[in-house]
Amino acid sequence: MANGKDVRIRVILECTSCVRKSVNKKSIGISRYITQKNRHNRPSRLELRKFCPYCYKHTIHGEIKK
């Protein structure tokens, strides 16, 4: 019954502004969230506005590869 390709998969979201700042070494760290997405409804990369504790504001967090 269970397929190898599940419909809901676990994804990691990473703050896009912290990634840009870490190149210049201005950021303390990089904010990451773990969530799930439905592969059939959202085949493209997931982007959500979440709170970043390093930037102290709401920023766009994008999906990264594992």
Swiss-Prot record:
Signal peptide limits: none
PROSITE patterns membership: RIBOSOMAL_L33
Record-level GO BP terms: translation
Pfam families (alphabetical): Ribosomal_L33
Xref: InterPro entries: Ribosomal_bL33 (IPR001705), Ribosomal_bL33_CS (IPR018264), Ribosomal_bL33_sf (IPR038584), Ribosomal_zn-bd (IPR011332)
Chief localisation class: plastid
GO CC annotations on file: chloroplast; ribonucleoprotein complex; ribosome
Molecular function GO terms recorded: structural constituent of ribosome
Keyword line: Chloroplast, Plastid, Ribonucleoprotein, Ribosomal protein
Intracellular or extracellular location(s): Plastid, Chloroplast
SUPFAM superfamilies hit by this protein: Zn-binding ribosomal proteins (SSF57829)
Record field: transmembrane: none
Family: Belongs to the bacterial ribosomal protein bL33 family.
NCBIfam families linked to this entry: PRK00504.1, PRK00595.1, rpmG_bact
Identification of the protein by name: Large ribosomal subunit protein bL33c
Species this protein is from: Populus trichocarpa
